[in-house]
Amino acid sequence: MTPFTEGIILLCIGIFGLAGNLLSIPYFLRRRPGQKTFYTLFIYLSVCDIIVVIIGMLLFGVPKVSEKYAEETFLIIAPYILPTFEIGSTGGIYFTMAICIERYLVVCRPFWYREKAIKSTIYTIPIVCFSVLYNIPRFFELKTVIDYGPVYNDTNKYLSAKDKTFEITADFDEKMENVSIYSIEATAMRLNVAYYGIYHIGCAIIFQFIIPLLVLIVGNVMILKQLLKDSRGSSPMCSDGARGRFSPQVTQHRRRKSQIGRTRVTLAICGIFTACHLFKWVLNIYELYVRYNLSEKETEQLLNDSVWFETVVSISNTLVVLNSSINFYVYLLKICWMA
């Protein structure tokens, strides 16, 4: 598959996802106040998904279909939008975890949940603050460098960051004076071995792999066990909307059915999230293994000059954008299926 085709596919996924996420915000704002926490978390997840989708298209889609954009605009904005992409991605990970935790409390600890009357701010404020603070160092990792000078016939100028993250070839048919040539270079902080090992590998594996995976696995297993018990009628699930009073039998049955529906949506979203982020997690673990078991030269060859590694990275980026594009559609499909 050519890079142009890959870019078109990612852009189509992104446009489809952007439309869904933009529609999801007014949709969830109109939901019943009894499930305010669940829908508020979904709204924040949609905002994070919008950030990931828009910037994902600018980073991984548009450069593959527009040479002019890739040679100038991309190289100017990449050092700033790449950290913003990571903020949205981190927020998406932790809001998915928050939705899973909220469903666990509603399903497995309904009376405690109703008694404590937990509000959405308990989740949203820490997640937003953590997502921003955790990714602040990324704003100081890359910089755009502009070179000025004449360019002659048949001259190919190869530009790349010091870590070979970005590269560009500029071809000119005739002599041109004072041409601006853009490139991206890694800063001294980004090139620091200790910083890269601790932040990019160690922290990424802990905060973006181990913790999310454990929370999602444990939370979903507990939810599934409780749903199985509930389906046998041994432990009726209480609604988070029925705080402080018990509803009539029919109303309670409807609320219980609605809760089960939202819980199944959560299980589906968590499963899709895990599948779409699996490539990213595998890449982090593989990079950790390579950097600590091979020489520097072998590491550079495997990570920067390997076609298969670039292909896996491209697939990983596409899957991350895909995950941020389909959450609302999963919710709608589940609601339609229940109806």
What is each stretch, according to the model?
Residues 42, 47-48, 157-194, 225-282, ...:
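Intracellular effector-coupling site of seven-transmembrane GPCRs
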Residues 2-31, 58, 214-223:
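First transmembrane helix
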Residues 215-221, 264, 268-285, 308-339:
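Seventh transmembrane helix
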Residues 66-88, 120, 130-210, 290-307:
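Loop architecture of class A 7-transmembrane GPCRs
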Residues 2-11, 34-116:
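Extracellular TM2-ECL1-early TM3 structural module of rhodopsin-like
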Residues 25, 29-40, 101-123, 217-265, ...:
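Intracellular signaling interfaces of 7-transmembrane GPCRs
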Residues 13-17, 44-56, 86, 90, ...:
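Alpha-helical transmembrane segments of multi-pass membrane proteins
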